[in-house]
């Protein structure tokens, strides 16, 4: 445990510059809901069946999105259709690409600045503010096992194929990993969740890092696998978790999928994972100043500023020092206005305990 305690500053930084504000979250929910309405209306107008349900996924659902100066936010909102509802006019099942094209056409709205585009695993709707909504499309199949129980499977329209997948399982995995407190309400009471967001913030703290570093799900998996809890010390928990992650990535860059054991999020030698490991090495080197015997609050604040490419921590140190000086300033000036009696003052009660 480092001598200089920066937990207060780290919690403040997370609250003010990492965590999304309620207003930002509300705006994103509004865009998401408008997109759902637009898709329903477009499909209805074309005479196509509607999705049976929508389900938010990814960092939005896991509550691990972080603030971005360029509003480069990615909201994943899955659309789930019954397989029997995804047929063409001849009654043949639609291919994965054809389904994405149908959804893209249904989202068409002349009032929007950008048309939706078909991507490999989703249909993407861009917005002028900088962020976008990705709509992965799933089809649901239902069969029976030998005991006549229902078996429900989900397939993602990926490329030209339908592949077994359901991102909601990843959300469940993360929520189970960080604790039940994440499943109730807006409050952020989990240290591991804060560490996840702080790590993502660091990984994207420079424009030159954003396009080179690894994905949010890879970072989340690495944090969960290597998390080091430090009660009431988010600064120590963050640093120790980073050390553990770097050690793992020095041995192997392969990151296993949290749900599907036959898949990997990243393979050996993955360039984005290697870049993330190098970034970790840089920031951990910067933080070595915390171990010096003569480390001060200012030095610690400057180090954390460099790590996150911010001025927040040093500003807090300046504010704290100003407050301390005002509290400790001698009251010499005030004595001039004080007057003292020239005669003995008798106490108004007897000595001792009354």
Could you tell me what each predicted segment is?
Residues 26, 39-43, 62, 94-147:
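Conserved catalytic core of two-metal-ion nucleotidyltransferases
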Residues 1-72, 79-98, 353:
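N-terminal regions immediately upstream of nucleotidyltransferase
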């Amino acid at each position: 445990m480092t001598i200089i305690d920066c937990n207060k500053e780290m919690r403040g930084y997370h609250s003010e510059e990492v965590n999304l504000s309620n207003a930002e979250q509300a705006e994103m929910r509004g865009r998401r809901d408008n997109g759902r309405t637009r898709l329903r209306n477009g499909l209805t107008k074309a005479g196509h069946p509607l999705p049976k349900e929508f389900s938010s996924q990814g960092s939005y659902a896991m509550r691990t999105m972080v603030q971005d100066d360029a509003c480069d936010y990615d909201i994943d909102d899955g659309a789930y259709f019954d397989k029997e509802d995804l047929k063409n006019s001849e009654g043949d099942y639609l291919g994965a690409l054809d389904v994405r094209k149908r959804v893209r056409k249904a989202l068409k709205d002349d009032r929007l600045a950008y048309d939706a585009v078909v991507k490999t695993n989703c249909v993407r709707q861009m917005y002028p503010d900088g962020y976008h909504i990705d709509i992965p499309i799933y089809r649901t199949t239902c069969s029976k096992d030998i005991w006549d129980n229902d078996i429900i499977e989900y397939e993602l329209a990926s490329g030209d194929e339908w592949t077994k997948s359901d991102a909601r399982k990843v959300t469940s995995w993360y929520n189970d990993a960080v604790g039940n407190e994440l499943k109730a309400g807006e409050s952020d009471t989990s240290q591991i969740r804060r560490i996840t967001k702080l790590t993502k913030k660091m990984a994207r703290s420079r424009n030159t890092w954003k396009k080179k570093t690894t994905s949010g799900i890879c970072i989340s998996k690495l944090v969960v696998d290597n998390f080091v809890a430090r009660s009431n010390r988010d600064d120590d928990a963050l640093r120790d978790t980073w050390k553990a992650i770097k050690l793992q990535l020095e041995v192997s860059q392969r990151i296993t999928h949290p749900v599907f054991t036959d898949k990997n999020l990243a393979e050996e030698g993955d360039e984005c994972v290697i870049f993330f490991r190098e970034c970790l090495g840089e920031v951990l080197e910067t933080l070595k100043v915390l171990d010096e015997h003569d480390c001060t609050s200012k030095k610690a604040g400057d180090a954390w500023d460099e790590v996150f490419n911010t001025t927040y921590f040093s500003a807090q140190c300046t504010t704290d020092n100003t407050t301390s000086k005002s509290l400790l300033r001698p009251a010499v000036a005030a004595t001039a206005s004080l007057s003292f009696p020239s005669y003995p003052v008798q106490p108004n009660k007897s000595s001792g305990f009354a």
